[in-house]
Amino acid sequence: MTTTIDTNQWCSRFVKCKGCKLDAECMVKPEEMALVREDGKIVDKWAIRTTEMIARELEKLKAI
């Protein structure tokens, strides 16, 4: 199954975001763009960071 993320739906909601120029909170260091192995597991740090960012925004929407 493929999941498509609508960046217009999410990215524009973040105050710091300037339209996916990677200068917002979601910006990562070059070494974080690659998958890494930690404790025998493959980790995508960029995906973790953006997922947490979206989760925070969803919680804010629930509170409204």
From Swiss-Prot:
InterPro entries: Antirestriction_protein_Ral. It comes from the Viruses. Keywords: Host-virus interaction, Inhibition of host innate immune response by virus, Restriction-modification system evasion by virus, Viral immunoevasion. Pfam families: Ral. One of its GO terms (biological process) is symbiont-mediated evasion of host restriction-modification system. Belongs to the lambda phage ral family. Ral interferes with the cleavage of DNA by E.coli EcoK restriction-modification system, by modifying the activity of the host methylase. This modulation allows incoming, unmodified phages to escape the host's restriction system. This is Restriction inhibitor protein ral. It comes from Salmonella phage P22 (Bacteriophage P22).
